[in-house]
A protein has these predicted regions:
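Histidine/acidic-residue-rich catalytic or RNA/ligand-binding cores of hydrolases
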Residues: 116-123, 163-178, 212-218, 231-245
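Mid-to-C-terminal alpha-helical segments outside catalytic/metal-binding sites
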Residues: 1-7, 33-41, 62-66, 74, ...
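Short, conserved clusters of charged catalytic residues that mark active-site
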Residues: 90, 94, 140-143, 208-211, ...
Length: 269
């Protein structure tokens, strides 16, 4: 209320998959049930994202379905890595396929990278300072090159922090295929930038640099930017103040704050 935010979409945070399969599954179901009670009490203020441990694909598919059908959840908050696998892994495909069938977007949330070179200098390097952006960028790039968006052409994916590394590298990704024809084992049927026009949206969460926003706007278009907050890791007020400080016109402000979410994801605001 203090920040003027009318509706938030909630999920539990990192860590649900760090235990054995049975414990992780019980924790996920219990957390989903508890969060659903909050949403049911204030449905005009909150919506929910499911968080799924990926030890067992069959469980993940069933729990995502339960979250949608019984609890009214909006999407799947998937991590950028699940320890030994990422979202391009064949074990994850049935869950992505079910998300499409349920018309649930997939938010790729950063997880601590399992990349040795990112470790050794503390949290600032391995988490939000660098590692999170790198890990999400790797995962989404692998999904593109694996042809997942070609197999699931209506899959909708959201990433945060003004698009992680993509605003700066997307053209070079295109050129590596279009000009240099470095295809290797890549199975994507379109240039990477085309999936950002049809399947991928970004949020403004936790990146308060005006030139970075302008870059993301130029690369992706204002229609592909959603308001996000990273709350409680970041300040709600600071997120709102940042967007309002950019000098956007009323139409663009509306698009970022609510219209894109309503138009492309049918979020009820």
């Amino acid at each position: 209320d203090e920040a003027g935010v009318d509706k938030c979409f909630l999920s539990i945070s990192l860590g649900i998959g760090q235990f054995d399969a049975q414990t992780s599954q019980k924790l996920a179901m219990a957390n989903h049930d508890e969060l659903a009670q909050v949403i049911a009490k204030y449905p005009h203020r909150f919506g929910g994202y499911a968080v799924l441990p990926m030890h067992d694909t069959e469980f993940a598919v069933k729990e995502l379905t339960r979250c949608h059908d019984e609890l009214g959840y909006f999407g799947w908050n998937a991590f950028s890595n699940f320890g030994d696998k990422r979202l391009d892994d064949k074990a994850c495909f049935p869950v992505l396929e079910r998300a499409v069938q349920l018309n649930m977007p997939v938010y790729i949330h950063p997880s601590v990278p399992q990349i040795p070179d990112l470790h050794g200098y503390g949290p600032a390097m391995v988490t939000s300072g660098l590692g999170f952006a790198v890990d999400v960028t790797i995962t989404l790039t692998r999904m593109i090159f694996a042809g997942i968006f070609d197999r699931l052409p209506t899959l909708k994916v959201i990433i945060g922090h003004l698009g992680e590394c993509f605003p700066m590298i997307l053209r070079r990704m295109d050129d590596s295929l279009r000009v240099q024809k470095i295809t290797g084992k890549a199975r994507n049927q379109k240039l990477p930038s085309e999936y950002f026009k049809e399947n991928i949206w970004i949020t403004s969460s936790g990146n308060f640099l005006a030139p970075a926003f302008q870059c993301a706007k130029d690369v992706f278009g204002i229609e592909h930017i959603l308001f996000g907050t990273d709350y409680p890791m970041e300040s709600l007020n600071e997120n709102v103040d940042f967007i309002e400080s950019l000098g956007l016109g009323e139409e663009d402000l509306d698009r970022v704050f609510w219209k894109n979410a309503e138009e492309y994801f049918h979020m009820k605001m």
